[in-house]
C-alpha cells in the first residue's frame, strides 16, 4: 500500500492518528542523543548558547528540542506499512507547554533559582 508523501505529512496536532499526540520518551531520547552527538562532533548550535550556564551538548540539544528549531520529521509506522511523518515542531510545542507548566509549579514552591528554563 503506497501513501502519497504529501498526504503522510501531518500539518496539525489533530491529524495525528498513529501513536500518541505527544513526543514519546523514546523519540525524545533518540532525537536528543543524535543531536548531542552532532554538537559534540562540531556542528553549530541552532540556538544562542551564550545565556546557558552549562555548554554541555546534551543540554544544548534538549533546549533546541524544546524550542522546536530542529528540522526533523518523525516517522511513525504501523505494522501494515501505513505511516505518518510528523514535524518535530508540532510535538515540541506540546512538550514546551508541559515543561512550562512544570516550571511554574517549581518556581511557585522552590523559587526562581530552581527554574528549568
Whereabouts are the PLM-identified features?
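Polar low-complexity intrinsically disordered regions
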Residues: 1-34, 38-117
Amino acid at each position: 500500500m503506497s501513501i502519497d508523501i504529501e498526504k503522510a505529512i501531518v500539518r496539525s496536532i489533530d491529524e495525528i492518528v498513529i501513536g500518541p499526540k505527544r513526543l514519546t520518551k523514546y523519540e525524545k531520547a533518540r532525537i536528543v542523543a543524535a543531536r548531542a552527538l552532532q554538537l559534540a562532533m562540531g556542528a553549530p548550535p541552532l540556538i544562542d548558547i551564550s545565556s546557558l550556564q552549562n555548554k554541555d551538548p546534551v543540554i544544548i540539544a534538549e533546549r533546541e528540542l524544546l524550542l522546536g528549531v530542529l528540522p526533523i520529521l518523525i516517522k511513525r509506522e504501523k505494522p501494515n506499512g501505513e505511516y505518518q511523518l510528523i514535524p518535530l515542531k508540532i510535538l515540541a510545542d506540546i512538550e514546551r507547554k508541559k515543561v512550562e507548566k512544570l516550571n511554574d509549579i517549581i518556581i511557585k514552591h522552590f523559587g526562581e533559582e530552581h527554574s528549568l528554563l
